[in-house]
Protein backbone atom coordinates (compact mmCIF):
# COMPACT_ATOMS: atom_id res chain seq x y z
CA UNK A 1 0.00 0.00 0.00
CA UNK A 2 1.34 3.39 -1.03
CA UNK A 3 0.86 6.53 1.07
CA UNK A 4 0.88 10.13 -0.13
CA UNK A 5 -0.50 13.57 0.61
CA UNK A 6 0.06 14.98 -2.88
CA UNK A 7 -2.63 15.06 -5.56
CA UNK A 8 0.03 14.99 -8.27
CA UNK A 9 1.08 11.56 -6.98
CA UNK A 10 -2.47 10.29 -7.48
CA UNK A 11 -2.60 11.65 -11.01
CA UNK A 12 0.73 10.00 -11.82
CA UNK A 13 -0.51 6.60 -10.61
CA UNK A 14 -3.74 6.98 -12.58
CA UNK A 15 -1.80 7.85 -15.74
CA UNK A 16 0.38 4.77 -15.24
CA UNK A 17 -2.59 2.37 -15.26
CA UNK A 18 -2.67 0.03 -18.28
CA UNK A 19 -3.69 1.99 -21.36
CA UNK A 20 -6.39 -0.37 -22.62
CA UNK A 21 -10.03 0.00 -21.62
CA UNK A 22 -11.95 2.26 -19.28
CA UNK A 23 -10.55 2.77 -15.78
CA UNK A 24 -12.63 2.99 -12.61
CA UNK A 25 -10.91 4.81 -9.74
CA UNK A 26 -12.46 4.53 -6.27
CA UNK A 27 -12.00 7.35 -3.75
CA UNK A 28 -13.30 6.28 -0.33
CA UNK A 29 -13.26 7.76 3.16
CA UNK A 30 -15.29 8.76 6.19
CA UNK A 31 -17.98 11.48 6.09
CA UNK A 32 -16.32 14.90 5.62
CA UNK A 33 -12.94 13.36 4.81
CA UNK A 34 -12.72 15.49 1.66
CA UNK A 35 -13.17 12.61 -0.78
CA UNK A 36 -15.67 14.53 -2.93
CA UNK A 37 -13.31 17.50 -3.23
CA UNK A 38 -10.40 15.20 -4.07
CA UNK A 39 -12.48 13.39 -6.71
CA UNK A 40 -13.57 16.69 -8.26
CA UNK A 41 -10.03 18.06 -8.26
CA UNK A 42 -8.64 14.90 -9.85
CA UNK A 43 -11.37 14.99 -12.49
CA UNK A 44 -10.73 18.67 -13.27
CA UNK A 45 -6.96 18.22 -13.52
CA UNK A 46 -7.28 15.19 -15.77
CA UNK A 47 -9.74 17.00 -18.03
CA UNK A 48 -7.33 19.93 -18.25
CA UNK A 49 -4.67 17.55 -19.56
CA UNK A 50 -7.10 15.84 -21.95
CA UNK A 51 -10.59 17.35 -22.34
CA UNK A 52 -13.55 15.14 -21.42
CA UNK A 53 -11.44 12.13 -20.50
CA UNK A 54 -12.80 11.91 -16.92
CA UNK A 55 -16.11 12.01 -15.09
CA UNK A 56 -17.41 11.34 -11.57
CA UNK A 57 -19.90 8.81 -10.19
CA UNK A 58 -20.89 9.66 -6.58
CA UNK A 59 -22.06 6.87 -4.30
CA UNK A 60 -24.40 9.38 -2.67
CA UNK A 61 -26.47 9.44 -5.86
CA UNK A 62 -27.73 6.03 -4.73
CA UNK A 63 -29.19 7.19 -1.41
CA UNK A 64 -32.68 5.84 -0.84
CA UNK A 65 -35.19 8.69 -1.10
CA UNK A 66 -36.41 10.34 2.10
CA UNK A 67 -39.94 9.07 1.42
CA UNK A 68 -38.71 5.47 1.48
CA UNK A 69 -36.44 6.04 4.49
CA UNK A 70 -39.33 7.52 6.47
CA UNK A 71 -41.66 4.69 5.45
CA UNK A 72 -39.08 2.21 6.76
CA UNK A 73 -38.51 4.19 9.94
CA UNK A 74 -34.81 4.76 9.26
CA UNK A 75 -34.74 8.37 8.06
CA UNK A 76 -32.82 9.42 11.18
CA UNK A 77 -30.05 7.03 10.11
CA UNK A 78 -29.72 8.43 6.57
CA UNK A 79 -26.14 7.94 5.47
CA UNK A 80 -25.69 4.58 7.19
CA UNK A 81 -24.71 1.62 4.96
CA UNK A 82 -28.25 0.19 4.79
CA UNK A 83 -29.74 3.47 3.50
CA UNK A 84 -28.26 3.05 0.00
CA UNK A 85 -29.30 1.11 -3.09
CA UNK A 86 -26.05 -0.87 -3.21
CA UNK A 87 -27.18 -3.33 -5.87
CA UNK A 88 -28.38 -0.49 -8.08
CA UNK A 89 -24.98 1.13 -7.62
CA UNK A 90 -23.24 -2.13 -8.57
CA UNK A 91 -25.42 -2.47 -11.66
CA UNK A 92 -24.49 1.07 -12.72
CA UNK A 93 -20.80 0.23 -12.32
CA UNK A 94 -21.31 -2.91 -14.41
CA UNK A 95 -22.83 -0.82 -17.22
CA UNK A 96 -20.01 1.70 -17.06
CA UNK A 97 -17.32 -0.99 -17.11
CA UNK A 98 -18.99 -2.74 -20.08
CA UNK A 99 -18.76 0.51 -22.07
CA UNK A 100 -21.18 -0.77 -24.72
CA UNK A 101 -23.64 2.15 -24.56
CA UNK A 102 -23.05 5.50 -26.24
CA UNK A 103 -24.06 7.26 -23.04
CA UNK A 104 -24.98 6.27 -19.50
CA UNK A 105 -26.92 8.86 -17.50
CA UNK A 106 -26.10 8.64 -13.80
CA UNK A 107 -27.55 10.13 -10.60
CA UNK A 108 -25.92 12.79 -8.43
CA UNK A 109 -26.48 14.00 -4.88
CA UNK A 110 -27.69 17.55 -4.25
CA UNK A 111 -26.13 18.36 -0.88
CA UNK A 112 -28.00 21.67 -0.65
CA UNK A 113 -31.21 19.70 -0.06
CA UNK A 114 -29.67 16.32 0.92
CA UNK A 115 -31.50 14.54 -1.92
CA UNK A 116 -30.30 12.31 -4.79
CA UNK A 117 -31.25 13.47 -8.28
CA UNK A 118 -31.72 10.75 -10.90
CA UNK A 119 -30.71 11.17 -14.54
CA UNK A 120 -28.46 14.17 -13.89
CA UNK A 121 -24.97 13.35 -15.16
CA UNK A 122 -24.42 11.87 -18.64
CA UNK A 123 -21.21 9.86 -19.07
CA UNK A 124 -20.14 9.38 -22.67
CA UNK A 125 -18.71 6.15 -24.03
CA UNK A 126 -15.56 8.13 -24.82
CA UNK A 127 -14.82 8.90 -21.15
CA UNK A 128 -11.80 6.82 -20.14
CA UNK A 129 -11.58 7.55 -16.40
CA UNK A 130 -14.52 7.37 -14.01
CA UNK A 131 -13.81 8.51 -10.48
CA UNK A 132 -16.21 6.84 -8.07
CA UNK A 133 -16.40 8.51 -4.66
CA UNK A 134 -18.17 7.51 -1.48
CA UNK A 135 -17.92 6.36 2.11
CA UNK A 136 -18.41 2.62 1.74
CA UNK A 137 -16.64 1.72 -1.49
CA UNK A 138 -14.04 -0.46 0.23
CA UNK A 139 -16.24 -2.07 2.88
CA UNK A 140 -15.42 -5.77 3.12
CA UNK A 141 -18.97 -6.90 3.95
CA UNK A 142 -21.70 -8.02 1.53
CA UNK A 143 -23.18 -6.39 -0.51
CA UNK A 144 -20.63 -3.56 -0.48
CA UNK A 145 -17.76 -5.98 -1.00
CA UNK A 146 -19.16 -6.77 -4.48
CA UNK A 147 -18.08 -3.32 -5.69
CA UNK A 148 -14.35 -3.96 -5.39
CA UNK A 149 -14.31 -6.13 -8.51
CA UNK A 150 -15.06 -3.06 -10.64
CA UNK A 151 -12.20 -0.88 -9.38
CA UNK A 152 -8.89 -0.56 -11.22
CA UNK A 153 -7.44 1.63 -8.46
CA UNK A 154 -8.60 2.30 -4.90
CA UNK A 155 -7.74 5.36 -2.81
CA UNK A 156 -8.67 5.83 0.85
CA UNK A 157 -8.67 9.35 2.30
CA UNK A 158 -7.31 9.17 5.84
CA UNK A 159 -8.18 12.08 8.15
CA UNK A 160 -7.83 12.33 11.96
CA UNK A 161 -11.13 11.94 13.82
CA UNK A 162 -10.84 15.37 15.48
CA UNK A 163 -10.66 17.06 12.08
CA UNK A 164 -13.58 14.99 10.78
CA UNK A 165 -15.72 16.01 13.75
CA UNK A 166 -14.89 19.69 13.26
CA UNK A 167 -15.81 19.54 9.56
CA UNK A 168 -19.02 17.62 10.23
CA UNK A 169 -20.08 20.08 12.90
CA UNK A 170 -19.58 22.96 10.46
CA UNK A 171 -21.55 21.09 7.78
CA UNK A 172 -24.61 20.75 10.03
CA UNK A 173 -24.32 24.34 11.25
CA UNK A 174 -24.55 25.41 7.59
CA UNK A 175 -27.66 23.23 7.22
CA UNK A 176 -29.31 25.12 10.07
CA UNK A 177 -29.30 22.43 12.75
CA UNK A 178 -29.32 23.49 16.38
CA UNK A 179 -26.80 22.16 18.88
CA UNK A 180 -29.05 19.26 19.88
CA UNK A 181 -29.56 18.26 16.26
CA UNK A 182 -25.84 18.53 15.53
CA UNK A 183 -24.96 16.38 18.53
CA UNK A 184 -27.47 13.72 17.44
CA UNK A 185 -26.12 13.69 13.88
CA UNK A 186 -22.54 13.39 15.08
CA UNK A 187 -23.06 10.78 17.81
CA UNK A 188 -25.75 8.63 16.18
CA UNK A 189 -24.83 8.78 12.48
CA UNK A 190 -21.63 10.42 11.27
CA UNK A 191 -19.04 9.37 13.84
CA UNK A 192 -20.33 5.76 14.14
CA UNK A 193 -20.30 5.53 10.33
CA UNK A 194 -16.74 6.83 10.27
CA UNK A 195 -15.69 4.25 12.87
CA UNK A 196 -17.42 1.50 10.88
CA UNK A 197 -15.56 2.55 7.72
CA UNK A 198 -12.21 2.59 9.50
CA UNK A 199 -12.78 -0.86 10.99
CA UNK A 200 -14.28 -2.60 7.96
CA UNK A 201 -12.58 -1.25 4.84
CA UNK A 202 -10.27 -3.45 2.81
CA UNK A 203 -6.70 -2.27 2.23
CA UNK A 204 -6.60 0.37 -0.54
CA UNK A 205 -3.97 0.66 -3.24
CA UNK A 206 -3.18 4.17 -1.98
CA UNK A 207 -3.82 5.96 1.30
CA UNK A 208 -4.15 9.72 0.84
CA UNK A 209 -3.26 11.40 4.12
CA UNK A 210 -4.90 14.70 5.12
CA UNK A 211 -3.88 16.17 8.46
CA UNK A 212 -5.41 19.64 8.16
Q: Where do the model's predicted regions map?
A:
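Walker A (P-loop) phosphate-binding loop of P-loop NTPases
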Residues: 32
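Extreme N-terminal, non-catalytic leader segments
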Residues: 1-26
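ATP-dependent NMP and nucleoside kinases share a basic, alpha-helical "lid"
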Residues: 113-171
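Conserved nucleotide-sensing/catalytic segment adjacent to the nucleotide-binding pocket
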Residues: 64-113
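Hydrophobic positions on the alpha1 helix immediately C-terminal to the Walker A/P-loop
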Residues: 38
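Conserved lysine of the Walker
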Residues: 35
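Short beta-strand-centered segment that lines the nucleotide-binding/catalytic pocket of NTP-utilizing
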Residues: 50-67
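Small-molecule kinase domains that catalyze NTP-dependent phosphoryl transfer to phosphate-bearing small molecules
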Residues: 119, 145, 170-212
Amino acid sequence: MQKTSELDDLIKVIQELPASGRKIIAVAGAPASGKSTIAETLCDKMNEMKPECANILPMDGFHYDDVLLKARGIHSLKGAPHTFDVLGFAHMLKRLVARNEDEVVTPVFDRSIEIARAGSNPISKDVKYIIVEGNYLLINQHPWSELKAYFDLSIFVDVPVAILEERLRQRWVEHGLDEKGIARKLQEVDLPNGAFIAANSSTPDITFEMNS
